[in-house]
Regions:
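Short glycine-/acidic-enriched loop or helix-start segments at secondary-structure transitions
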Residues: 10-13, 52, 134-135, 192-193
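Acyl-CoA/ACP chain-elongation machinery
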Residues: 3-4, 49-54, 130
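Condensing-enzyme catalytic core mediating Claisen C-C bond formation in acyl metabolism
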Residues: 15-96, 100, 104, 198-210
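Acidic-glycine-rich active-site phosphate/pyrophosphate-binding loop
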Residues: 1-7, 73-79, 132-142
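Short, surface-exposed connector motifs at secondary-structure boundaries
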Residues: 114-119
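Phosphate-binding/catalytic loop of phosphoryl-transfer enzymes
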Residues: 1-19, 24-29, 189-191
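Acidic, glycine-rich active-site loops and adjacent beta-strand->loop/helix elements
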Residues: 3-9, 46-48, 153-155, 185-190
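Claisen-condensing/thiolase-fold acyl-transfer catalytic domains that form or cleave C-C bonds
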Residues: 99, 103-106, 121-210
Length: 210
């Protein structure tokens, strides 16, 4: 499973609300089927399309192809300047979506699959924003020791943020122990995914910087 994103290319240097946390990264995960543990991962995916305009690059696709006007810089609130090839984010709407829907989706997953919350070793959150993540963690009732962060080092790396978190903050634990992990990603759509996995003795290469 290959995932990669160069978010810094989509962030306007004149958008102080996002530019400085946009991170670039890629991940590669080899997934192997195990007959002894066919239910290795449980997932729940949701999309709420009425929030599509809250996190979007307006131009560059089939609906709105690139045109000369795509490059025109425009002024937005709080001194932000960007064009229609830059990421546009309504921070308050994305925040509201995340803190309202991610904990709810986790609780539904835990109930549906009869997961014992006391047996969960780690809660891995998409590293969108430390403030977002802390709100979700507290709503979920998890200790800070079970909820690692690396956004202070790498920023928001989009779909690679959870694999990056595993490599940088949990390398030893994942290599040596059997772990029960809750994880989530959320963003463009607006969409979210939550999951639960049982993993042990992973082979994890060292992080490569570029």
């Amino acid at each position: 499973l290959l995932v990669g994103n160069t978010q810094s290319y989509y962030a306007s240097p004149e958008d102080k609300s996002y530019y400085f946390i946009a991170g670039d990264a890629g991940s590669a995960i080899a997934v192997e089927y195990n007959q002894e543990n066919p239910s290795l991962i449980q997932l729940s995916l949701k999309t709420m399309g009425n929030g599509k305009d809250f996190l979007i690059v307006p131009d560059g696709g089939y609906r709105n192809p690139v045109s000369p006007s795509s490059f025109e810089m425009r002024d937005f609130e709080d001194g932000v300047r960007r064009n229609n090839l830059h990421l546009h984010m309504n921070g308050m709407e994305v925040f509201s979506f995340a803190i309202s829907n991610v904990p709810k989706a986790f609780k539904e997953l835990i109930t549906y699959f009869n997961i014992e919350k006391a047996n969960i070793d780690y809660l891995l959150l998409h590293q969108a924003n430390k403030f977002f993540c802390e709100k979700i963690r507290k709503k979920m009732g998890f200790d800070i020791e079970k909820t690692p962060y690396n956004i202070q080092e790498f920023g928001n790396t989009s779909g690679t943020s959870v694999p990056l978190l595993m490599v940088t903050n949990m390398h030893k634990q994942l290599s040596e122990r059997k772990l029960n992990i809750l994880f989530t990603g959320f963003g463009v759509g607006l969409s979210l995914g939550v999951g639960y996995m049982k993993i042990e003795n992973l082979i994890i290469p060292e992080l490569l910087y570029y």
